[in-house]
């Protein structure tokens, strides 16, 4: 009951029976060119080469080169990644297709850089016309993350004190959940409070959008018994676990890879159309 009172205090609990979450899935993407591939692992670039799916070791090596060789900063890449995530969400679930106005979104952030991507994503979702709420149970005491929290607070984005304990409560309150808990560098067992959070997410009927890796999945092998997102936003390049993704929408985001780095790792990234920062792989 304390969790319910917290939610009521935020003015987020909506009376009445459960509403349908998505009334239509309107396509906002450009018409697919004739060379567009439909197979998950066989997504083709214009040159005909398959986009490379990275192992955990390869993903870490690419990240380190971006930071060390190319002198990108963490906050710079985080901003670009978070914007890509919000853009992909707006394409898959445009506000006009949702039953609430503005559409309600719960963004669950973990303690690492994936959580930082989620904070940036929430800020851009607010600018795109959504009503995000953030649950951020383990906050790092670092200037980068405290700054991101302040930015969200200044934009009147609420932070939950407790995670709704039952899937039905989340289904009633929100039309979409963004999973920004763990990224590709996560290893080991999932500990509390995130084990309980993932248990709640596994029982949802509203769609889940996972950033880079569905939380709780092995970076290369996936997890058939874990959460099953409807949208996956791969960042920089897809990871091998994405071959096990069975949802409706798979976007590639993070249009910041230097051509020389792409060539070195044979990423075969697609040609993003015009000024787009995301590319639909599936």
UniProtKB/Swiss-Prot annotation:
Residues with the Phosphoserine modification: 43
Sites where the protein binds K(+): 114, 179, 215
Pfam families (alphabetical): YjeF_N
Required cofactor names: K(+)
Chemical reaction(s) catalysed: (6R)-NADHX = (6S)-NADHX; (6R)-NADPHX = (6S)-NADPHX
Residues engaged in binding (6S)-NADPHX: 113-117, 183-189, 212
Cellular compartments per GO CC: cell body; cilium; cytosol; extracellular space; mitochondrion; nucleus
Compartments in which it is found: Mitochondrion; Secreted
Domain YjeF N-terminal: 59-269
N6-succinyllysine sites (modified residues): 138
Cited function: Catalyzes the epimerization of the S- and R-forms of NAD(P)HX, a damaged form of NAD(P)H that is a result of enzymatic or heat-dependent hydration. This is a prerequisite for the S-specific NAD(P)H-hydrate dehydratase to allow the repair of both epimers of NAD(P)HX. Accelerates cholesterol efflux from endothelial cells to high-density lipoprotein (HDL) and thereby regulates angiogenesis.
Protein name: NAD(P)H-hydrate epimerase
């Amino acid at each position: 009951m304390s969790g319910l009172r917290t939610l009521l205090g935020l003015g987020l609990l909506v009376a009445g029976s459960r509403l349908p979450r998505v009334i239509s899935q309107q396509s906002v993407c450009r018409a697919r060119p004739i060379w567009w591939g439909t197979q998950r692992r066989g997504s083709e670039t214009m040159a005909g080469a398959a986009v490379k799916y990275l192992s955990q070791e390869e993903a870490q090596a690419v990240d380190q080169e971006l930071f060390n060789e190319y002198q990108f900063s963490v906050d710079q890449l985080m901003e670009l990644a978070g914007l890509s995530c919000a853009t992909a969400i707006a394409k898959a679930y445009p506000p006009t297709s949702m039953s609430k106005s503005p559409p309600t979104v719960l963004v669950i952030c973990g303690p690492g850089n994936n959580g930082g991507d989620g904070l940036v994503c929430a800020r851009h979702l607010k600018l795109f016309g959504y009503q995000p709420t953030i649950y951020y149970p383990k906050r790092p005491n670092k200037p980068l993350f405290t700054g991101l929290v302040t930015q969200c607070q200044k934009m009147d984005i609420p932070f939950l004190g407790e995670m709704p304990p039952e899937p039905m409560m989340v289904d009633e309150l929100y039309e979409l959940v963004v999973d920004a808990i763990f990224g590709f560098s996560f290893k080991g067992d999932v500990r509390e409070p995130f084990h309980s959070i993932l248990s709640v997410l596994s029982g949802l009927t509203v769609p889940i959008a996972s950033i880079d890796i569905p939380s709780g999945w092995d970076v290369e092998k996936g997890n058939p018994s874990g959460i099953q997102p409807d949208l996956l936003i791969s960042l920089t390049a897809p990871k091998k676990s994405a071959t096990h993704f069975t949802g409706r929408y798979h976007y590639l985001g993070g249009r910041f890879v230097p051509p020389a780095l792409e060539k070195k790792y044979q990423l075969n990234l697609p040609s993003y159309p015009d000024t787009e920062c995301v590319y639909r792989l599936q």
